Amino acid sequence: MKEISCGRRTRVSFGKSREPLPIPDLVEIQKISYRRFLEEGLLEVLKKFSPIYSQATRSDLKKSDRGFALEFVSTRIGEPVVDPLECKAKGLTYSVPIYATARLTDMKSGEMKEEEVFLGYIPYMTDRGTFIINGAERVVVNQIVVSPGLYFSSEYIDREEYGGYFLPSRGAWLEVILDPYDGVLYAGLDGKKVNLFLFLKTIGYEKDEDILSLYPTYLDADDEDSLLLHVGSILLEDIYDGDRKIAEKWDILTKDLAERILMIDDINQIKIVHPIAQNTFEKMLELVSSSGEEGEEEEEKTKIYGLNEVTVVDAYLEIFRRLRPEELPRINAAKRYLHDLFFNPERYDLSEVGRYKVNERLRNAYIRYLIEVEGEDPEEARKKVYNETSLVLKPLDIVLASRILFDYFERRYVNDFEIDSYELKNLIRIFKEEYLEKRKTAPYDLRKLVSVFRRNYGVTSDLGVFAAIRYVSNINKELPSIPFDTKDHLGNKRVRTVGELVQREFERLFARAQKAIQERLTLINSLSKVSIQSLINIKSIISTVNQFFAMNQLSQFMDQVNPLSELTHKRRVSAVGPGGLRRESKVFEARNVHYSQYGRLCPIETPEGANIGFITSLAIYAKIDEYGFLMTPYRKVVNGKVTDEVVYLRANEEEEYKIIPATTPVDEEGNIIPERVVARMGEDIRLVPKEEVDFMDVSTKQPFSVSASLIPFLEHDDASRALMGSNMQRQAVPLLKTEAPLVGTGMEWEAAKNSGYVVLAEHDGIVKEVDAARVVVHRTDENGNLMYDDKGNPVVDEYRLLKFVRSNQDTMINQKPIVNEGDFVKKGDPIADGPATDMGELALGRNILVAFMPWEGYNYEDAILVSQELLEEDVFTSIHIEVYETQARETRLGPEEITADIPNVSKELLKNLDENGIIRVGAYVVSDYGVGSQAILVGKVTPKGEGDTTPEEKIIRSVFGERGRDVKDTSLRLPHGVEGRVIRVDVYDQNDIAELGAGVLKLVRVYVASRKTLDIGDKLAGRHGNKGVVSNILPKEDMPFLPDGTPVQMVLNPLGIPSRMNVGQILETHLGWLAKLTGKWFATPVFEGAKEDEILRPLYEERKKRGLHLGDDENNPNGKVVLRDGRTGEPFDNPVVVGYMYMLKLIHIAKEKIHARSTGPYSLIHQQPLGGKSHFGGQRLGEMEVWALEAYGAAHTLAEMLTIKSDDIKGRNEAYKAILKNMNIPEPGVPESFRVLIKELRGLALDVRLYDENGNEIDIDKY
């Protein structure tokens, strides 16, 4: 065990591995991305659209008298005008002004004019990686999407094809498809299949010789089967017998020629057109050429037929007919259409990352192309890389992609289609013995081939025939199978960070503004008379970008329950959102954990609902490269020795390496101890010699997110319970009295430090002043000497602390100093705690003495029995701050007035209001002073509409002025069920906030802090997914107690462990007790935590010293103790597991959920009570409840529930009057919902009428 420093505390760590890589800044992904957007991305967008020409210049430059061009040269970001705290208080957006230097050029004279123009305000990121939009803190979540690139998918197998597709960032998909039945290559254009060779003719390969030369294959000249199988193929080289040429390039391989070649010793191989390419060529001829050589099938051809018969024009027109059958084919329209589809940068964009992925995917195919087609030396060819830079498709991209299909075709067929082995053997025999001798069809025309076999040999399986062909032709090659690309592999997915998301939005909107700028350019007559600022009016763009922050699915209201929830939200990765997957998607593979996520995305932390697997969290060490691909670090291993060199690898780069876990034993020098070790390679786990190992994990925490790495003994918990533990830590309410866990993982300090709420020293120094609101540190130099400026004044850093700030979820953000005057602090040391932190460490809950035992049924269904001691000591007490606001508006009848002069209100309700009618700070307010009276926070009156005034009223008005006027009380009152202390009041008018809103004269916000103690129904949880609600609060003297008389503080259900398989909580309980007894703080890092014997033996020894060992076994310690019943003093039947567990109080507080209503608001349309606490609604009497009352025969109860208690307006008024007058309640009337039903049926043109039992029509409008 070793000691590690965690904030201002030292922990004893059980971790054994050395971690050479410090944990990075956990919020840097957000900060770096947005900084890059402001510094580079903004200018990239402006330059992409520069220069913008006037319309005259663009259409006719030479004839134009005055053509102008506008160009953006640089951008500049100003300083924020208002600080973040003021923005939150006033409901403003924290933003910065952006400026651009623009240059206007007269294209005719060459005269230029440069000017810096103001573009508008854009939201600015705070130091903590958040945005403040309209006063609310928000986070832009990272989005993970399939990367643009080239993919060969197994989805084509379902259509019994091989295929790949180019996926661009913007534009249409281009598919390359091989149909093994036809033996033809196709291009998928706009969802339609066309012959690939036709398409190649339109993109630069005009001659058939050029196209056929792209697809060579080599035959072994000594393999009789192979040669005979390829009779009819086109030769791609001259063939010599000694010095005599026996066949020329472009001749046909005949049976006679094949037999002759077999007899020549000097020929090792012959080069022919790949049979599929030849078949594609022949199908193209059939498609376009009207003439054919019918009746010549029986004759053996020796020369190629139809070479260059199909022209480029034919190709264009045939493709256009296929793609746009409703239009008349015209050559210019066809050219323009195809060009726009894949080769026009304005319509098609692969993006830089897409081009990188295409180049990477085509790298090996390019090397083979150089060797086979260009004839380069293999050694030289392997040194070359495919380095295309164009962001649109190039002809060679398509050729190389189609050549890759041959590899799938050659190597995978028998694997991909299930073929009966007996039938396959039979077919191979037929091929060898009979078919090769009698062959009459093209080598890969399956349709003809199958018909021959059906007719001659009685074979029915198409796939079997094809498999036999492939098997015979490859029988001596032993080619390895190649895998398909999968969208779920992280090598094929990239992360769009906040900067890229905003940049994409900005680019989309600027494309619209370009036209408006262009139109203004056409109106210019002279450079001297124009202001560039007047040309550029992109405020609408900026306002729409601001709208992106306010409305986009990926810009989310920040989860601010505690520092961990905020940190996790910033590191969240979402697969849903614009351009991503849909939540309703039934693609379960996309939700699964994929092996490529190791060290990049956490396999544990994800929501439990509809978003499971779609929303994930970044692993601790994960980084994002310039293309948006996730990388994870590894330590390099050389000859079985682990070095400290750290290498970051992308998911696809990792595939070929053997990687061992961080727990692998190594000696002091880094040499791996075992001779054979367990290593990962791709998705395989294998045992390899240590010399073959390439890399080692940098840490055992590497695969997990921050939340998951905060769970001690994670390795002993079932994954689904660990998921709940991760999620529930984010829901823990910051407590009044914080306490770090006795059993931590060492990550508590890192999480708190990166949350932004722990104040860290920016420089070394000595604390000069400390109070509740600030800390002043006198800086020191490297030698520890105090620093002074030129005038002899001390150089000090002043740290202002946040006091009683409300979070997004109404929890309290409060910072308090943890240093004393005179303390020396180093740079990076914590000097003040934030919410849910203790001595610089994350402290989400409290260490509680728990016992696992049943107690009078109060443990039923995971319920928790707690001691009154927890309330007395304020252990789970939390402060919640709610804000209430009201506006004084200008109405049609006059202005509303904020005043203490409210009609018909008791003095009791007005006693805490000041002379302006606003509650005083410090007042304690409760929601109910009496029946129906709620505390007034802001007194407000609204003018009432008046009819004709009587003479008496006119006299009163003249004597008392406006006080005699009739007003309505519209005061802001405290909602039901709330009580607390007013801690702050903000009053704003138009002078304070310019954008206060139309007709708003004054805005008042009242902040009320309420103290929530632990109560029955509150939800508590541990860190292992163990959760329950408080069932009862017992006096501490009734709680079970230890042999020394100490009562336990909480009783948990032991049945919650075996089936849930989260045994980590038991180990935590034992180690927690050991920590408490020894006064130490432990760190048990994930996957290298304390072992049982390291806990139970020392625990027994410590308990024995204190006489607490009763019930434990010295020879085989189990950590159990004999407890006694607090009520009787009798011992319980069996020893019980007792110890200290870290428990959290979650934000699901019973008091906030409980709600009751007698009468209240009704829905306008169907007149039924509203639903939910927020609307002061009633409980729904659903159909099942109606069935229950029907079954019970409670007719009268049912009648009044469906009418006067629900939506019978007349009936409920009559019932109210009857109750007041102490009379019998009258018969109920017609429910309003029935009237609505009748109206809807009449709206459907159905004449619905009502009749009574005597056949008389009832008018429901009068009833």
From Swiss-Prot:
GO molecular function terms noted in the UniProt entry: DNA binding; DNA-directed RNA polymerase activity; ribonucleoside binding
PROSITE patterns, alphabetized: RNA_POL_BETA
Keyword Protein biosynthesis among record annotations: no
GO CC list: DNA-directed RNA polymerase complex
CDD domains according to UniProt: RNA_pol_B_RPB2
Top EC group: transferase
Alphabetized InterPro entries for the sequence: DNA-dir_RNA_pol_bsu_ext_1_sf (IPR042107), DNA-dir_RNA_pol_bsu_external_1 (IPR019462), DNA-dir_RNA_pol_su2 (IPR015712), DNA-dir_RNAP_su2_dom (IPR007120), DNA-dir_RNAP_su2_hyb_sf (IPR037033), RNA_pol_bsu_bac (IPR010243), RNA_pol_bsu_CS (IPR007121), RNA_pol_bsu_protrusion (IPR007644)
Regions annotated as coiled coil: none
Superkingdom classification of source: Bacteria
Reaction catalysis annotation: RNA(n) + a ribonucleoside 5'-triphosphate = RNA(n+1) + diphosphate
Biological process annotations from GO: DNA-templated transcription
Keyword vocabulary terms for this entry: DNA-directed RNA polymerase, Nucleotidyltransferase, Transcription, Transferase
Gene3D superfamilies membership: 2.40.50.100, 2.40.50.150, 3.90.1100.10, DNA-directed RNA polymerase, beta subunit, external 1 domain, DNA-directed RNA polymerase, subunit 2, domain 6, RNA polymerase alpha subunit dimerisation domain, RNA polymerase Rpb2, domain 2
EC code: 2.7.7.6
Summary of subunit composition and partner proteins: The RNAP catalytic core consists of 2 alpha, 1 beta, 1 beta' and 1 omega subunit. When a sigma factor is associated with the core the holoenzyme is formed, which can initiate transcription.
NCBIfam families: PRK00405.1 (NF001616), rpoB (TIGR02013)
Function statement: DNA-dependent RNA polymerase catalyzes the transcription of DNA into RNA using the four ribonucleoside triphosphates as substrates.
Protein family per UniProt: Belongs to the RNA polymerase beta chain family.
Protein name: DNA-directed RNA polymerase subunit beta
Species annotation: Thermotoga sp. (strain RQ2)
